[in-house]
Amino acid sequence: MCDTIVATPAYTKNGKMLFAKNSDRSPNEPQFLQHIPAKDYDLQKTPTLALTYVAVPQVEHTFEITISRPSWMWGAEFGFNEFGLNIGNEAVFTKEKYVKTDGVTGMDMLRLALERCRSAKEALDFLTDFIEKYPQGGNCGYGKKFYYHNSFLIADSSDAYVLETAGKYWVWKKVK
């Protein structure tokens, strides 16, 4: 599994939130950093957004983001947006059944939250609502089948949360 860490302002020498993530994806999988400017959409022309496996409703405005993502996937393993919102994704293995087709990957959810949310709390609320409406799933492996549920570490300059998920179930805790 990957590692994502956060040090909250109460525990850093300079009083700043620190966020870091590594990746343990396939060593041959191309992954790159991508900067995507903020954008306005005409919902009459573009009512939906195609994710890796499914489409979801588009919004009128998306925020500027920088993400690290596998080349073949719409979503991202880690990223941040113009408001200083940071999110990292982890694989979670549970007894809950996996949706092997037509699901939303955790990496897709991560990118959606960065594009649509201004704060850690807003991203937490967005992700928990989204998980209840859209099934997690789809192959997340490069060159092989790999299915899992997701955990997210979500942080902005003042708040941090851990969100653990399995299917439509979720639980979160604020990081002190």
Show which residues each predicted segment covers.
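A contiguous strand-loop segment
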Residues: 2-106, 126-176
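A structural signal for well-ordered alpha-helical segments within the folded catalytic domains
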Residues: 107-108, 121
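Short, charged, surface-exposed loops that flank catalytic or proteolytic processing sites
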Residues: 116-124
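Second-shell loop/turn segments in exported
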Residues: 99, 109-116
